[in-house]
C-alpha cells in the first residue's frame, strides 16, 4: 500500500517542504557537517560502481538533495557533472527544481538518485518525470523507507517495496535491481530498501 497525506493545495505542499530546508538553524548544522556527510555517502554509490560507472560523463542529478552531500560524493567518485536539485538551492552544486515538474529536457539524463520518495505528493508524476528525462538505458537509484513512520515533512508511506515496483512498472520502467539496503550508516539508517530502475 502507498498512502499519501491529504494536503489541499500544491502550494501548501511546497511551503511544507521548503520549511525544513529554509530553517536557518538546520542549514547551519548541515553546512557544518557537509564534508563529513559527503564522505558517508560514498559507500552508498560505491556498492553499485559497476552499474553506474558508464554514466560518469553523463548528466547526473540527486533529487531533493538539500545541501547536496550526495552530489559531492558522486563528484568525488568521478561523476563530474553530478548536481543536486531541491526547492531551495545551495551553493553551486544544488540547483532549484521541483521533482514533479523538472526543468530537464527529454532523454537528457544518465542517472538520477533520490532518497526522498516519501516527500512526493504525487508519486506517479514524480516517477513519470524521471522516466521522461532519462536517456534510453538510463538508471534511477531510489533509496526507500519501507514501513517507516512519516516525519513532519514526509507525505507518502510505503508498506511494501512491491507497491513501489508496481507503480514504477506502470510508468514504463524496467526493474534492474531491488534489494534490502546493505550499506547502513547513521545518516541513512531509515532507508532500508534500494531499487534501481532502468528506462529501456
What is the predicted role of each segment?
Residues 100-112:
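A short acidic, Gly/Pro-enriched loop at the edge of an enzyme's catalytic core
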Residues 48-56, 102-103:
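Glycine-rich helix-loop-beta junction characteristic of Rossmann-like nucleotide cofactor-binding loops
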Residues 124-139:
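A short glycine-rich, Lys/Arg-flanked "PGG" loop and its adjoining helix->strand segment in the class I
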Residues 58-101:
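Class I SAM-dependent methyltransferase SAM/SAH-binding core
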Residues 110-123:
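A short SAM/SAH-binding and catalytic strip from SAM-dependent methyltransferases
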Residues 137-147:
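Conserved beta-strand signature within the Rossmann-like core of class I S-adenosyl-L-methionine
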Residues 155-178, 193:
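Short alpha-helix
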Residues 1-52:
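Class I SAM-dependent methyltransferase Rossmann-like catalytic core
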Amino acid at each position: 500500500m502507498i498512502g499519501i497525506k491529504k494536503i489541499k493545495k500544491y502550494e501548501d505542499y511546497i511551503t511544507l517542504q521548503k520549511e525544513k530546508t529554509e530553517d536557518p538553524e538546520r542549514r547551519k548544522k548541515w553546512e557544518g557537517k557537509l564534508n563529513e556527510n559527503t564522505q558517508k555517502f560514498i559507500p552508498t554509490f560505491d556498492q553499485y560502481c559497476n552499474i553506474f560507472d558508464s554514466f560518469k560523463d553523463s548528466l547526473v542529478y540527486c533529487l531533493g538533495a538539500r545541501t547536496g552531500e550526495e552530489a559531492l560524493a558522486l563528484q568525488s567518485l568521478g561523476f563530474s557533472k553530478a548536481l543536486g536539485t531541491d526547492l531551495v538551492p545551495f551553493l553551486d552544486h544544488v540547483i532549484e527544481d521541483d521533482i514533479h515538474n523538472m526543468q530537464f529536457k527529454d532523454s537528457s539524463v544518465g542517472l538520477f538518485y533520490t532518497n526522498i520518495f516519501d516527500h512526493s505528493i504525487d508519486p506517479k508524476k514524480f516517477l513519470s518525470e524521471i522516466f521522461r528525462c532519462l536517456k534510453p538505458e538510463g538508471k534511477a537509484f531510489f533509496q526507500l523507507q519501507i514501513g517507516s513512520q512519516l516525519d513532519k515533512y514526509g507525505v507518502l508511506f510505503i508498506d511494501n517495496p512491491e507497491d513501489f515496483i508496481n507503480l514504477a512498472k506502470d510508468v514504463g520502467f524496467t526493474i534492474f535491481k531491488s534489494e534490502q539496503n546493505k550499506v547502513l550508516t547513521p545518516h541513512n539508517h531509515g532507508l532500508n530498501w534500494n531499487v534501481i530502475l532502468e528506462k529501456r
